[in-house]
Amino acid sequence: MTAPAQVPDSDEGFIRFEGIHKSFGPKVVFDDLNLSIRKGETLTVIGGSGAGKSVLLKCLIGLMDPDRGRIFFDGQETTGFDEKQFLPVRRRVAMVFQGSALFDSLSVGENIQYPLREQEPDMSEEERAKKVARVLSLVNLPGIEGMRPSDLSGGMRRRVGLARAIASDPEVILWDEPTTGLDPISTRIIDELIRSMRAKLHVTSIVVTHDMQSAFTVSDRIAMLANKHIVQVGTVAEMRASPLKEVRAFLDARKGEARVE
């Protein structure tokens, strides 16, 4: 059966992927992938396991290179940048990892300060402490600077990971499966935080998730990755009403995954 045509996305976005091809040996992950992300929006990328959602994030920040195609960040092409050239881009981007990626040997406060010491070496200890307190308040975890990650629940660890990410004042936040493995209450808290980051900090967010309830809650637009490219980009209402078989099959398969609270 013929695959649906690649979705054109000519909108001059803040972040753009144009004609991206990526393979790992014989496995083709992207074949002429195009996607545009608008400044200040929350765009969620959905798709089956192994579709390449996380690979897309890694290509954006230079952890992987596309085989062909072009990537633009705020009007500047970053394709082919070396590590030194990517540094200014990475300082504008923060990633919230599925596993939080906290150092168990450090306190919560020390974990949040860790990237600040490298990125802002001239910042005083008092300024760092104030920033840590501010970002912990933003994720509704005030006063836990002295706790260890091992003392925290999974949801709290995820929120500390977010606090560390926003401590560097990013313009873009990348969320890699932010609700995976969390209980329904923690999931709802993370969803609310994703929404509040846009409202309070005016960041651009790219969310990778299998959790369609979360995607419907947090997204301005949703992009469906299937058949090695983006088959549809649309609002929540447009995706719910999509006639495309790839989108319908993906959504129908997840109808039974409703959260129990």
Feature names for model-found ranges:
Residues I61:
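Helix-to-loop junction immediately C-terminal to a conserved catalytic motif
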Residues Q76-E77, E120, S124-I144, R195:
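Conserved ABC ATPase "signature" region
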Residues T78-A94, E118, E125, M239-S242:
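ABC ATPase NBD coupling module
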Residues R148-L152, M156:
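Conserved ABC ATPase signature
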Residues A167-E171:
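A short, proline-enriched helix->beta-strand linker immediately N-terminal to the Walker B motif
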Residues I173-D176:
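Catalytic Walker B motif of ABC-type/P-loop ATPase nucleotide-binding domains
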